[in-house]
UniProtKB/Swiss-Prot annotation:
Keyword ATP-binding: no
Protein name: Large ribosomal subunit protein eL31y
One Pfam family named in its UniProt record: Ribosomal_L31e
Keyword vocabulary terms for this entry: Ribonucleoprotein, Ribosomal protein
Length: 119
């Protein structure tokens, strides 16, 4: 019998490009920026396998920079799965989503990148 393949429970950091335009296509104007934050949380939860997702203040500011009606079409984010140090925490890991640097040539063709941490 084969072993059950589960998500590896380790600390890891990855960079993703999220296409928010596709996720917010049929959304009302006055709900676009809040829905963008919810979609980023949902994406990080799916990719990292953690229920506890924390969004950085800078990422929140960038989403809301053009108001409630104009979130960016695509955004480059860095998602880090970290160990939860709280004793009364429900889960062992949490995800921290921050904004990543955008290269001068744009977002096309970047793909997913694993970041090596210097600890």
């Amino acid at each position: 019998m084969s072993e059950k393949k589960g998500r590896k429970e380790e600390v890891v950091t990855r960079e993703y490009t999220i296409n928010l335009h596709r996720r917010l296509h049929s959304c009302t104007f006055k709900k676009k920026a809040p829905k963008a934050i919810k979609e980023i949380r949902k994406f990080a939860e799916k990719e990292m396998g953690t229920k506890d997702v924390r969004v950085d203040v800078k990422l929140n500011k960038q989403i809301w920079s053009k108001g409630i009606r104009g979130p960016p079409r695509r955004i480059r984010v860095r998602v880090a799965r970290k160990r939860n140090d709280d004793e009364d925490a429900k889960e062992e890991f949490f995800s921290l989503v921050t904004v990543a640097e955008i290269p001068a040539e744009g977002l096309s063709g970047l793909g997913t990148k694993i970041i090596e941490e210097e600890d």
